[in-house]
Amino acid sequence: MQTSETGSDTGSTVTLQTSVASQAAVPTQVVQQVPVQQQVQQVQTVQQVQHVYPAQVQYVEGSDTVYTNGAIRTTTYPYTETQMYSQNTGGNYFDTQGSSAQVTTVVSSHSMVGTGGIQMGVTGGQLISSSGGTYLIGNSMENSGHSVTHTTRASPATIEMAIETLQKSDGLSTHRSSLLNSHLQWLLDNYETAEGVSLPRSTLYNHYLRHCQEHKLDPVNAASFGKLIRSIFMGLRTRRLGTRGNSKYHYYGIRVKPDSPLNRLQEDMQYMAMRQQPMQQKQRYKPMQKVDGVADGFTGSGQQTGTSVEQTVIAQSQHHQQFLDASRALPEFGEVEISSLPDGTTFEDIKSLQSLYREHCEAILDVVVNLQFSLIEKLWQTFWRYSPSTPADGTTITESSNLSEIESRLPKAKLITLCKHESILKWMCNCDHGMYQALVEILIPDVLRPIPSALTQAIRNFAKSLEGWLSNAMNNIPQRMIQTKVAAVSAFAQTLRRYTSLNHLAQAARAVLQNTSQINQMLSDLNRVDFANVQEQASWVCQCDDNMVQRLETDFKMTLQQQSTLEQWAAWLDNVMMQALKPYEGRPSFPKAARQFLLKWSFYSSMVIRDLTLRSAASFGSFHLIRLLYDEYMFYLVEHRVAQVTGETPIAVMGEFGDLNAVSPGNLDKDEGSEVESETDEDLDDSSEPRAKREKTELSQAFPVGCMQPVLESAVQPSLLNPLHSEHIVTSTQTIRQCSATGNTYTAV
């Protein structure tokens, strides 16, 4: 190959520049212009079809001829690592023309040789090079043993090239091709590449048709849409999946983005499909101690499997499982600390109980991971030997080998005896807290991550049924054990309801935080709030440091002005919580201080909302939504922080007062070390009469209004700070107002 400096048309040297933006997986090769003097007509023809741009290099053998039809013959060289490529003989050629950064060069289909010497035919493919990298468009592999490229997202140059390709191959009009850009952008906004997942081709096209219908766009046909998909998401493979007779073509390696609105659309469509199916007859359930194949629990005699409803449920469950964290495992259960054995039991019975309960909890975890919540009731009935004489719903419960095995390992009589022992109660409660915490982290691994509405509704229905299922399954178990178990499962159900509500609020608030006009309006309305008045009113109740409150106000406005994301707001709230509770770390009063902080936080936020309401702020709705989210997320943060400090699980923290029968004023103030508690409780022993009532009686003498303020501050206010005395303040002796020459006076009746 040579570079001539002579020519009748141009006197400049035609040179080439090596590529600096190419992927290691695909060598970039581009066309070199030939000397103008030798092949004037041929060069003119080539220039009309192929273009040479800076930032690329092409190697052409000296003996190669130039084809006038635009088909460029190229040669590739095997390599093992990223480097500058050149011929074995000859030098590198550089081009100094132009400096465009957004250029695209097309190389026709050619053969490639892998590093292992395997011939790979790439047919119908195009290489697109730009400043962002090199992309392979619309290729197919004859040898799947070596992958030329990996599935990746297209660059802007790829989008432009895809439009040109479709316009040339399908003969699209200029008007229709101009619409392809919006179609391609819609694909990039709603889909992403992922390993090990697939989507039916018909589903993608139906989503596309719905998008075109909503935006009044002219859709392309299914074949052209398939080309769009492959031009944007390179390396996609097509598979035929499904049962025999019902298989469909799927794109393998692509999925709907978690935050895409198509997720909600897909869930709603599946839900409506299930609602339109006729109700099947009730199936006969076979109780299981541990579920190896969860589908077996739903199979009854005379029932046909593989129906459309079952297929819909299976597809929905598989889609939902990508939102779960199936890597969670049960924590290790501790040993039972028991000093004396109950009558009629041995240590072997206790070991059998530990082993059986561990297997029982593992079966529950397996069922939850597979989203088959209805099996939980059957598992509970099997473990607790539920045996009603006449089932209320007419279902038939069949004795199984698993139930016989459980009975042989630990008879029901011994199970009931062990359930009465305090050590067994405490051990099983700790096991439940650990298991339920693992289930929460499986179902809702991130409270801020979008969750499909159908999955959220399924979790809430599951939480609503838990207490009834467990109470019904334990109908023959001692009442003390039932109370312990129900308290734990109630905390679990409450946590699921709170977290799903928090997730729903997070998705609603995310849209507000991403709206620039709404953020500006919120900031304008917030600057009109009289925070000095808010602090003056709240300080009497909360007694917070003025400097800290002012600092929080400044930080909140600054974070709002920066248009922070939801995740950045979450980090800010966590920092506020850590600073507020830092003085109480390592002290026994930490849990109570955390609860007091929640009350103060809620009181301050309600005062701000009240001011916005009175001012008829235009952004009141946005502030109300944000306030609900931040209050709920602060509750979430405090809950986990208390669990971390106390060494317990969040479920255990919330289940501390889960048993309503055990709640009493003494339990509510059991935290020791509280300064407020020590000051208010020391006077209770001096008189049999409650302190609040005694203080109110002492005020029976008439005082002018101006003289009562110091008395109220010194006497009534400390009582308000203690929940023990709140009921006495409400039910204290009535007073009547009397008018006198000196002013209004109050006398006890």
From Swiss-Prot:
Q: Where is the composition biased (Acidic residues)?
A: 674-687
List GO molecular-function terms, semicolon-separated: DNA-binding transcription factor activity; sequence-specific DNA binding; transcription cis-regulatory region binding
Residues the UniProt record assigns to the DNA-binding region sit at 183-258
- Classify the main location: nucleus
Tissue-specificity statement:
Expressed in ciliated cells of the node and in the ciliated ependymal cells of the subcommissural organ (SCO), choroid plexuses (CP) and ventricular walls during embryonic and postnatal development. Expressed in developing and mature pancreatic endocrine cells during embryogenesis and in adults (at protein level).
One Gene Ontology CC term in the entry? nucleus
- From which domain of life does this come? Eukaryota
**UniProt-listed SUPFAM superfamilies:** Winged helix' DNA-binding domain
PANTHER family linked? RFX TRANSCRIPTION FACTOR FAMILY, TRANSCRIPTION FACTOR RFX3
Subunit composition?
Heterodimer; heterodimerizes with RFX1 and RFX2, and RFX6.
Q: What name does UniProt use for this protein?
A: Transcription factor RFX3
Organism, per UniProt?
Mus musculus (Mouse)
| Name of the gene encoding the protein in the UniProt record | Rfx3
